[in-house]
Amino acid sequence: MNKGKEILLGHGERIRIMSAFSISYPTLRRALRFETDTELARKIRHTAISEYGGMERAN
């Protein structure tokens, strides 16, 4: 489902999100790169932007 977008986050923020959602790095990476569009992926993207300062970038 890659729309040519991604959410940019620092390494520390990625670690905190993985811990908060109890997910693996590949799950986080696929969500932030818009490769998946599940309910969990949408929650991860929303949290990354609203709580961890993530920036959405179009490729």
Across the structure, where does each feature detected by a protein language model lie?
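Short helix->loop/beta-hairpin flanking segments within DNA-binding domains
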Residues: 1-4
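Short amphipathic helical patch at the helix-1/turn junction of helix-turn-helix
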Residues: 8-9, 19
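Short Lys/Arg-enriched helix C-cap and helix-to-coil transition segments
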Residues: 9, 39-59
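Residue-level signal for the short linker/turn that defines the boundary of a DNA-recognition helix
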Residues: 11-12, 23
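DNA-recognition alpha helix
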Residues: 13-17, 51
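Short alpha-helical "recognition helix" segments of helix-turn-helix
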Residues: 16-21, 28
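Recognition helix of helix-turn-helix/homeodomain-like DNA-binding domains
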Residues: 25-36
